[in-house]
């Protein structure tokens, strides 16, 4: 039994007209039709809709249809509350919500020693006195980069480089303080602060290639903080908490660069360059971590021993939060993320207090940085809410807002129900006692903005009117009177400034009118969202069909899979992507399906935790069951059902091809093939350490190569410079296939490309290879005959 039917898709009318009513309607329609024909004959005017263009693959890859969003920087300009900066072309304008709108600086102002700076990015100090611009940026890892920085004084118009003794330093990270215009930055893995008076203060002296101060190493950047920074400023900007990461015990992974960073004029050009990265794999050492707090007034740093001599060995620090100007809350898990602890440290008294420790028997604690304090200097009415913090905790299988007292007593839940708080608390209104958050209360595929009253615990919807679909995000001003509301879909995105005090206030920041105009001339697929039920479990799916879909034809079906733990692909977002191209282009006209199987997020924690310790089992089964459902539909060509994915989606593609017989074709890009080869923090969170789950690791790897010989054909692609999912994974797969005498596959290798496969025009190349290959597999329509041709049948 399942929830999907033709009625859901609008293929069968469910009108309830009686026969007499039908006859009247038919007569009326006949009269209208006759008059319409007469009118068209007399006027000789054609009102047929204009011919639309097909989506271009190059336009998809080059993101022609990517929506625009204004970068809004909240500042404190000349004592004006809730002012912000917005970029308009080459101008950076300072605005307030009602009156002020003036240019703070122009790109033409960025001149150093007579040379116009071609900047990569910019950020503004909170007092708007300085603009920090980066130049000559080079990518480090996914979220980090190296760059040279310049400071533009908005009052004097002077431009100075960030460095010391007229040296132009290449800097790893630079961040403004929350007040004034102090600047923290990392150079050669040591932490510095540029003070308000312009002097530079060095805080650490032990930075090396293995020791990182205030900066993430590879594993913390990729799997824990999703940021290059481990710096947290105190609210008054007098102190900095930061992590010291030491990866000297981590084994080094080496991979070659064949073309990147090689100068053909040098003798060593004939030899490839060797790249080395400290990459912890399951069961191997992780970086050791220490928390320091630096007092900028005394130039003293203190090391706080938060996790020594206790069961929570090898901690992974998830979050650091300043409670006030002298106390810090630190949240960390054990190595495999089954236990979590929150500790409060007083930086002046040097005392440490455990607020909360809890463990799970099944599942894991996801990484989150959602904890927030009640605003300082709040009204005495809400004084009881100041001695603790707000965070997201599990309650009856879902994640909800809670207040956690510092005294260790039980949490107070602010929300409850069969839905998730996905982001919050975003803002806490200290005047009215309202806590703002984003949630799936309306539907798990949507995100709406709400607030809950601390007085009554009633929930009020801001974007949720009970009818309109929507996926929103938001950012609040520091004082909380205004917020930027971003609408991400399903229709064309827009951006507005709204007020928490005045419901009628609305300032449009971005309408994406140009994008709307572009979309008006192209053919897009129809998109449907629904739920599919099998084995008493319900799944969200998204289906894209050709715009001229004909129920009497037979269509190939392509599943697009990701499926990683806690992820979500079936969401009501605006997207004109590769899947839209394959569904709408007249050469292909595939039905493209995405199903969020077990292990994915926002369908209950039991649904998510079901894959714990045996990745790949339920995820592939769910894709297979969904594949069988679509293959049985009368308008589907059951012999041409394929699946493809990237990264975890590549792994899921291979695992599904290995274990499910409904798919004849598949494409796996940058796939994991053996979890023993992936990084420790991610893998152990879901699989535990290898020594405690040998059978789980064995079963989860791609290993039954005989099953691949039964496929019609499959395709694998990987970049040799992938620092995330190493090329080693695909080489292990190729070796197993060769040993099994399996020859029905194709492979594309992209020299020196990282996980995104973009180096040296590889972005265009990979998608052209994918589209050509899947066209050969599932069939390409001959424009002269309208007949679908299959290369490998």
Swiss-Prot record:
- Cellular component, GO annotation: plasma membrane; vacuolar membrane
Reported EC number(s) for this entry are: 3.4.14.-
Instruction: Tell me a GO biological process for this protein.
Output: protein processing
UniProt topology in membrane? Single-pass type II membrane protein
| Keyword Glycoprotein among record annotations | yes
> What Gene Ontology terms describe what this protein does at the molecular function level?
aminopeptidase activity; dipeptidyl-peptidase activity; serine-type endopeptidase activity
Q: Which residues lie on this side of the membrane: Lumenal?
A: 46-793
Q: Where does the UniProt entry place glycosylation sites?
A: 101, 136, 246, 299, 303, 324, 336, 377, 384, 407, 535, 761
Q: What transmembrane ranges does the database entry give?
A: 25-45
**Top-level EC class:** hydrolase
What InterPro entries does this protein map onto? AB_hydrolase_fold (IPR029058), Pept_S9_AS (IPR002471), Peptidase_S9_cat (IPR001375), Peptidase_S9B_N (IPR002469), Serine_Prot_S9B/DPPIV (IPR050278)
Q: Which domain of life is it from?
A: Eukaryota
Q: Report the principal subcellular site.
A: membrane
Q: Which residues lie on this side of the membrane: Cytoplasmic?
A: 1-24
Q: Does the keyword Transmembrane apply?
A: yes
Q: What is annotated as the active site? A: 647, 722, 755
Where does this polypeptide localize? Vacuole membrane
Keywords in alphabetical order: Aminopeptidase, Glycoprotein, Hydrolase, Membrane, Protease, Serine protease, Signal-anchor, Transmembrane, Transmembrane helix, Vacuole
The UniProt family comment states:
Belongs to the peptidase S9B family.
Q: What is this protein called?
A: Putative dipeptidyl aminopeptidase C2E11.08
Q: What is the lineage of its organism?
A: Eukaryota, Fungi, Dikarya, Ascomycota, Taphrinomycotina
């Amino acid at each position: 039994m399942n929830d999907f039917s033709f009625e859901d898709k609008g293929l069968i009318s469910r009108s309830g007209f009686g026969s007499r009513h039908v006859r009247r309607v038919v007569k009326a329609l006949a009269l209208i039709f006759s008059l319409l024909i007469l009118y068209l004959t007399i006027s000789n005017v054609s009102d047929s809709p204009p011919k639309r263009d097909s989506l271009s693959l190059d336009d998809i890859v080059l993101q022609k249809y990517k929506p625009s969003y204004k970068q809004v920087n909240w500042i404190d300009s000349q004592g004006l509350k809730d002012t912000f900066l917005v970029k308009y072309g080459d101008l950076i304008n300072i605005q307030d919500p009602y009156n002020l709108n003036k240019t703070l600086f122009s790109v033409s102002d960025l001149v150093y020693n007579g040379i116009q700076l071609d900047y990569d990015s910019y950020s503004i100090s909170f007092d708007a006195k300085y603009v920090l611009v980066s130049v000559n940026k080079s990518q480090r890892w996914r979220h980090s980069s190296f760059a040279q920085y310049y400071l533009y004084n908005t009052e004097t118009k002077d431009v100075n480089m960030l460095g010391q003794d007229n040296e132009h330093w290449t800097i790893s990270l630079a961040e403004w303080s929350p007040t004034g215009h102090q600047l923290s930055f990392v150079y050669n893995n040591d932490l510095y602060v540029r003070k308000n008076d312009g002097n530079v203060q060095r805080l650490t002296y032990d930075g090396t290639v293995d020791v990182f101060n205030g900066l993430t190493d590879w594993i913390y950047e990729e799997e824990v903080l999703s940021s290059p920074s481990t710096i947290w400023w105190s609210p008054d900007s007098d102190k900095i908490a930061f992590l010291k990461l030491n990866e000297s015990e981590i084994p080094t992974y080496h991979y070659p660069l064949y073309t990147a960073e090689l100068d053909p004029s040098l003798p060593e050009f004939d030899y490839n360059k060797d790249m080395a990265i400290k990459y912890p794999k399951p069961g191997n050492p992780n970086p050791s971590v220490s928390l320091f707090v630096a007092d900028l007034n005394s130039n003293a740093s203190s090391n706080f021993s938060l996790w020594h001599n206790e069961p929570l060995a090898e901690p992974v620090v998830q979050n650091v939060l300043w409670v006030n100007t002298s106390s810090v809350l630190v949240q960390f898990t054990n190595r495999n993320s089954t236990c979590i602890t929150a500790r409060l440290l007083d930086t002046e008294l040097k005392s440490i207090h455990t607020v909360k420790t809890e463990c799970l028997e099944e599942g894991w604690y996801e990484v989150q940085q959602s904890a927030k304090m009640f605003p300082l200097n709040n009204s005495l009415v809400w004084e009881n809410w100041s001695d603790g913090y707000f965070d997201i905790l599990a309650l009856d299988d879902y994640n909800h807002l809670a207040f956690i007292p510092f005294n260790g007593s039980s949490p107070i839940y602010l929300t409850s129900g069969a839905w998730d708080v996905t982001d919050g608390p975003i803002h806490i209104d200290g005047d009215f006692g309202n806590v703002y958050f984003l949630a799936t209360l309306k539907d798990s595929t949507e995100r709406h903005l709400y607030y809950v009253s601390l007085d009554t615990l009633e929930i009020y919807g801001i974007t949720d009117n009970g009818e309109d679909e929507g996926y929103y995000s938001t950012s609040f001003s520091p004082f909380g009177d205004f917020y930027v509301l971003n609408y991400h879909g399903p229709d064309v995105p827009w951006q507005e400034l709204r007020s928490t005090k005045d419901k009628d206030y609305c300032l449009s920041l971005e309408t994406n009118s140009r994008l709307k105009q572009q979309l008006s001339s192209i053919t897009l697929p129809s998109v449907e969202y629904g739920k599919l039920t099998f084995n008493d479990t319900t799944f969200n799916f998204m289906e894209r069909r050709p715009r001229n879909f004909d129920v009497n034809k037979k269509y190939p079906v392509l599943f697009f899979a990701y499926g990683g733990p806690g992820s979500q692909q079936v969401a009501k977002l605006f997207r004109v992507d590769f899947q839209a191209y394959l569904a709408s282009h007249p050469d292909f006209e595939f039905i493209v399906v995405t199903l969020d199987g077990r292990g994915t997020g926002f369908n209950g924690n039991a649904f998510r935790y079901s894959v714990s310790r045996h990745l790949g089992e339920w995820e592939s089964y769910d894709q297979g069951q969904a594949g069988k459902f679509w293959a049985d539909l009368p308008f589907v060509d059951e012999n041409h059902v394929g699946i493809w994915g990237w990264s975890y989606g590549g792994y899921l593609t291979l695992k599904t091809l290995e274990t499910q017989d409904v798919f004849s074709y598949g494409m796996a890009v940058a796939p994991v093939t053996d979890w023993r080869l992936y990084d420790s923090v991610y893998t152990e969170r879901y699989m535990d350490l290898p020594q405690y789950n040998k059978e789980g690791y064995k079963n989860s790897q791609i290993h039954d190569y005989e099953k691949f010989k039964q496929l019609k054909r499959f395709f694998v692609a990987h970049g040799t410079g992938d620092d995330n999912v190493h090329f080693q994974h695909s080489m292990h797969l190729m070796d197993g296939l060769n040993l099994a005498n399996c020859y029905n596959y194709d492979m594309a290798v992209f020299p020196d490309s990282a996980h995104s496969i973009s180096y040296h025009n590889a972005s265009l190349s990979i998608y052209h290879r994918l589209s050509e290959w899947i066209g050969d597999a599932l069939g390409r329509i001959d424009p002269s005959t309208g007949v679908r041709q299959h290369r490998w049948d």
